[in-house]
Amino acid sequence: DRYYTRRQAELLDKQIDDPNIITTFAMRYGNPSIKKMLTHLQKAGCESIVVLPLYPQYCAATTATVCDEVFRVLMKMRWQPQVQIVPRYYDHPVYIKAMVNSLERDLERLEFEPKQIVLSYHGVPKKYLQKGDPYHCQCHVTTRLIREQWPYKDIPIETTFQSRFGPQEWLQPYTDETLEGLGKQDIDSIMMACPGSVSYTHLRAHETAM
């Protein structure tokens, strides 16, 4: 994640092209940490900060922890800049269009014609949904909007959830079980994508490939 997140920040900085705006990144669980980056911005004299969580769909386990950590760090600093948090953008037209365009480019690079597209989102325990977390619903809305703009209507698109562990029930359908089921239906050419994170993840790609 770190490599791609850094590259995104670098490319965004080039696009903004404003010497008065610092475009950088921080990791929730890694380096540079949110604390380290906020300290850097303080020393740089920043008075206004825009925080962009790289999770299109809101979840208490992801987006909320980023926001919590930002304000937890600021509470202990004698520096209170104006802070704006970019809200969830799971249904934003620009995001949806970018996902569709990305899928089309990937489809053109394939050496086979897929019979099915599986959109695999990072899973969370089902109890999150039962407590009112909107993540599950927002993932399905993202898939629906992608499906509506997808030009190849003969290739169906399905939502699944991956990365579960432990004995408790997680969001379903599970990615691995879905792939097994498709194989039993003789659907042997499948295209997969993970639209639940703006930053590409090797771990998730490897996991789903397994």
Model regions: which residues?
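N-terminal glycine-rich anion-binding loop in soluble enzyme alpha/beta folds
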Residues: D1-I22
